[in-house]
Amino acid sequence: GCVLLPWC
């Protein structure tokens, strides 16, 4: 999962 990218 992504942490810094809200659109991931």
UniProtKB/Swiss-Prot annotation:
Signal peptide: none annotated. GO terms for cellular component: extracellular region. GO terms for molecular function: ion channel regulator activity; toxin activity. InterPro entries: Contryphan_CS. Expressed by the venom duct. Keywords: D-amino acid, Disulfide bond, Ion channel impairing toxin, Neurotoxin, Secreted, Toxin. The modification D-leucine is found at L4. PROSITE patterns: CONTRYPHAN. Disulfide bonds join C2-C8. Its target is unknown, but this toxin may modulate voltage-activated calcium channels (Cav) or calcium-dependent potassium channels (KCa). This is Leu-contryphan-P. It comes from Conus purpurascens (Purple cone).
